[in-house]
A protein has these predicted regions:
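Alpha/beta enzyme core
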Residues: 28-68, 84-105, 109-206
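Short, flexible loop segments at the rims of nucleotide/cofactor-binding pockets, characterized by
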Residues: 18-22, 81-83, 172-173
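N-terminal binding-site loop/beta-alpha segment at the start of enzyme catalytic domains
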Residues: 9, 15-33
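N-terminal amphipathic alpha-helix/helix-capping segment at the start of soluble metabolic enzymes
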Residues: 1-18, 89-97
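Short glycine/proline- and acidic residue-enriched helix-loop micro-motifs
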Residues: 71-80
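Detector for methionine-enriched segments
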Residues: 1, 9, 54, 60-63, ...
Length: 206
């Protein structure tokens, strides 16, 4: 049999097939099935910042409507509301590392540089072999320049790589004013891989 072993982000893979972040990698059962199918590594389904923000905002709106909101509530939502999905994600990483023998790569979908560096550290502590930062800056703000959108990537990379020692990859959007130059500058940061491109659902006409 041919030797298909490769190195990706410094990780030894038995073959170059990596199961991308998706519904297939969102559960331990799915991850084990992918290993049984022969993949070389898995990227766990992304932890989405937008979903956590929306859940938190919905809860705050409900509390505000019924008059149950106080200044200290902001502290509560800063941690407790975010903790539940993050804790579940950390558990999935730990369980996967215990059950499978292929590299397990965590994935964070970021739109800000606020909390994610701290979460990245916890992901490393849970045993993830590497981390994929799925960064997206929607180019729809008339007051935000292309340079400001790109700066978000570098801010997140700088903060995360200063806190973790596991390999870090960045998955980028195809919305770039100068893709070649942007890729070159990303390659000069401490990240170990650039993934092209993240995929977002678009409206369609039936």
């Amino acid at each position: 049999m041919k030797n298909l072993t490769v190195k990706y982000m410094g990780l030894a893979l038995k073959n170059p097939i990596v199961a991308a972040s998706s519904g297939l990698t969102s559960s331990l059962k799915g991850i084990k099935a992918l290993e049984d199918s022969g993949v070389g590594a898995v990227v766990i389904k992304s932890l989405f910042e937008e979903e956590i923000i929306m859940e938190t905002q919905d809860s705050m709106n409900r509390m505000q409507a019924t008059g149950f909101i106080y200044p200290e509530t902001m502290e509560y939502f800063d941690f407790d509301e975010i903790e539940d999905p993050v804790a579940n994600y950390i558990k999935l990483i730990s369980d996967a590392k215990r059950e499978v023998n292929i590299p397990v790569i965590a994935s964070i979908n970021c739109v800000t540089a606020h909390k994610w560096p701290d979460f990245a550290k916890r992901i490393q502590e849970a045993g993830a072999d590497a981390l994929e930062l799925n960064i997206f800056a929607l180019p729809s703000d008339f007051n935000r320049t292309a340079e400001e959108n790109e700066k978000l990537y570098f801010d997140i990379i700088e903060r995360v790589t200063s806190l973790v020692s596991i390999p870090v990859a960045v998955k980028i959007s195809h919305y770039n004013a100068s893709l070649a130059s942007f890729l070159k500058r990303l390659s000069e940061t401490p990240i170990k891989s650039i993934v092209l491109f993240n995929r977002f659902y678009n409206p369609d006409i039936d």
